[in-house]
């Protein structure tokens, strides 16, 4: 790994990231910014790999935070889906040809997960879905052609969704 860049809009989260990196004897460039406002933080260099831990409804953490059931409303989902789509589009633009983008949420809603990735692929037919490692499938409850969904409690984990995309090299 040549360089790692972490972007978060919450300075307090970045402090925790910095503490964890120091504990593990790793280094990263930490940037406090809105990731979707690329022009404000991006230096023009394309990334080989991107982990997009997208803002989401956090419905996957319901077993540890049961109050989320009352804190979330149906009207919360559409704005989150729009932000996720914007982030996917912008991160795809700064991903190098031949690069990989891992999209992740802690949501259990298809609109934020497989449907989001399906819509992205329809707009970017060049994007290739890469199968995730088989060992992850043991905790998954919904493995399909579009990512992997872990439901809360499976493997004593929170709920998560992952989809790995590859941006083909230009020929």
What annotation goes with each model-predicted range?
Residues 1-171:
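S-adenosylmethionine
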């Amino acid at each position: 790994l040549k360089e790692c860049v972490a972007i978060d809009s919450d300075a307090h989260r970045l402090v925790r990231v910095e503490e964890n990196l120091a504990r593990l004897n790793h280094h990263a460039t930490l940037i406090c910014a809105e990731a979707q406002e690329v022009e404000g933080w991006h230096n023009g260099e394309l990334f080989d790999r991107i982990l997009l831990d997208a803002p989401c409804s956090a419905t996957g953490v319901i077993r540890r935070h049961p109050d989320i059931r009352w804190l979330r409303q149906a009207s919360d989902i559409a704005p989150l889906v729009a932000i996720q789509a914007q982030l996917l589009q912008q991160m795809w633009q700064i991903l190098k040809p031949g690069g990989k983008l891992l999209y992740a949420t802690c949501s259990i809603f298809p609109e934020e997960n497989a449907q989001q990735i399906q819509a992205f692929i329809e707009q970017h037919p060049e994007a290739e879905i890469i199968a995730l490692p088989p060992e992850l499938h043991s905790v998954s409850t919904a493995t399909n052609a579009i990512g992997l969904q872990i439901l809360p409690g499976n493997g004593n984990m929170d709920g998560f969704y992952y989809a790995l995309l590859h941006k083909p090299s230009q020929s």
